[in-house]
Amino acid sequence: ARKHTQYVQIFKNCGPSAGMSIRHSHWQVMGLPIVPRRAAVMAENMQEDDCLFCKMLTYEKEQKKRIAAETEHFLAITPYAGRFPYELWLAPKAHQRDFGDMNDAERKDLACLLWEMLQKVTSLKKDVGYNICVMDGPRNRDFHWHIEILPRIGGFAGFEYATDCFICMVSPERAARYYRGEAEE
């Protein structure tokens, strides 16, 4: 990394509704000289000795209502206050600062989980767009990396843009049931 790069964002836009501008499949990597506000706030709460993200994963595992899938090394959860219908986070169970810190077994486990979850995302509706964001920590800061999958169902309007508050029409519990393959009542 260059010395002026403070934050690196890895992402993929799939489909026109998700901002895809080039038709072939590709990932993008951007290095920023600043730390985005959301990443900075998250980093403040993810210190290894007192990681809010670790606590959230422990809570979700105990409650089981918002667990979409679980593997040996990862949890897939539908976040309590998601911004998008069927939003999904894939996170290592153990505290890991960087996406690059995985060993071979963890990489294989993540690849299988990501594939499984993307099959379900793309089955939500015909030609659904989605974004995949690898959320790594700011340079030289502790963090709990994770992947966010953001299906682009519905859209933002004036309220969301004006307030940075999101109205999500699908509860995270309902989304988790969908990802687990449970029939709706």
Segments from the language model and where they lie:
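HIT superfamily nucleotide-processing domains
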Residues: 1-185
